[in-house]
């Protein structure tokens, strides 16, 4: 296995680039829970600090960063509502980035998957797993505070509508949304580019300002991620 040569801070807070002796590069985050990985990712020790390799084929946020995301609104101390947290791959890296003074509320609909997320959260006190249906944000309104960032990764035909509805409940004015658009979950017959355009129009008609649209290929085929700001 290749060995790490250097670890450098990227232009995004708490996100690093690991260079290996074979000339390859990987994203990584500083491990909040030293000695433990989450999804089989490599742990990297460098100058007395442990980092976790961030696999862009397993995490759409990592893919977006490698595909040129200009700014990451998730930083140290950020409060995040994550819809579609699944078993905890991406939200665990969010946990590393926001550190202990941040909070990551993870909504997941599947009881089986939430059990896996709970295991991750047991070691990460800044992750708050919620077994809930993202279509009904009122069901978790009593436990989720207003957040700085809404991250949405759900496979529903009305995923953008669900995101907008949650934003009205929880996203601060001038807060940011990272919306994963899964073209094949919306319409298998249309060109993905047409779908991305239509979903962005929905956002802009609901007081969101589009900042950037990123096609996630080759990390995720027929997926895009949209960074937008909520004007309230």
Swiss-Prot record:
Instruction: State any GO BP term from the record.
Output: box C/D sno(s)RNA 3'-end processing
Keyword Transmembrane in the entry? The reply is no
Which EC class, in a word?
transferase
Write down the InterPro entries for this protein, in alphabetical order.
Fibrillarin, Fibrillarin_CS, SAM-dependent_MTases_sf
Q: Which domain of life is it from?
A: Archaea
Query: Which cysteine residues pair off into disulfide bonds?
Result: none
Per UniProt, S-adenosyl-L-methionine binds at 89-90, 108-109, 133-134, 153-156
Identify the keywords attached in UniProt to this record, alphabetized. Answer: Methyltransferase, RNA-binding, rRNA processing, Transferase, tRNA processing
Q: Which GO terms describe its molecular function?
A: histone H2AQ104 methyltransferase activity; RNA binding; rRNA methyltransferase activity
User: Briefly, what is this protein's role?
Assistant: Involved in pre-rRNA and tRNA processing. Utilizes the methyl donor S-adenosyl-L-methionine to catalyze the site-specific 2'-hydroxyl methylation of ribose moieties in rRNA and tRNA. Site specificity is provided by a guide RNA that base pairs with the substrate. Methylation occurs at a characteristic distance from the sequence involved in base pairing with the guide RNA.
Q: Which NCBIfam families match?
A: PRK04266.1-1 (NF003275), PRK04266.1-2 (NF003276), PRK04266.1-3 (NF003277)
Give the protein's recorded name. Fibrillarin-like rRNA/tRNA 2'-O-methyltransferase
């Amino acid at each position: 296995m290749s060995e790490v040569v250097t670890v450098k801070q990227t232009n995004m807070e708490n996100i690093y680039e690991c260079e290996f002796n074979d000339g390859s590069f990987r994203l990584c985050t500083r491990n909040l829970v030293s000695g433990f990985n989450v999804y089989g990712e490599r742990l990297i020790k460098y100058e007395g600090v442990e980092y976790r390799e961030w696999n862009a084929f397993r995490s759409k946020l990592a893919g977006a960063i490698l595909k040129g995301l200009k700014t990451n609104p998730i930083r140290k101390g950020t409060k995040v509502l994550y819809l579609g947290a699944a078993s905890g791959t991406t939200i665990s890296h969010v946990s590393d980035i926001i550190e202990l003074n941040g909070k990551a509320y993870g909504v997941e609909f599947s009881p089986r998957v939430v059990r896996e997320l709970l295991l991750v959260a047991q070691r990460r006190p800044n992750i708050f797993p919620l077994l809930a249906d993202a279509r009904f944000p009122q069901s978790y309104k009593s436990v989720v505070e207003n957040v700085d960032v809404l991250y949405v990764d759900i496979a529903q035909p009305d995923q953008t509508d669900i995101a907008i509805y949650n934003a009205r409940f929880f996203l601060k004015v001038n807060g940011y949304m990272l919306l994963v658009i899964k073209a094949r979950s919306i319409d298998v017959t249309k060109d993905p580019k047409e779908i991305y355009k239509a979903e962005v129009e929905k956002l802009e008609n609901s007081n969101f300002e589009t900042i950037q649209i990123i096609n996630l290929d080759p990390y995720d085929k027929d997926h895009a991620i949209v960074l937008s700001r909520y004007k309230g």
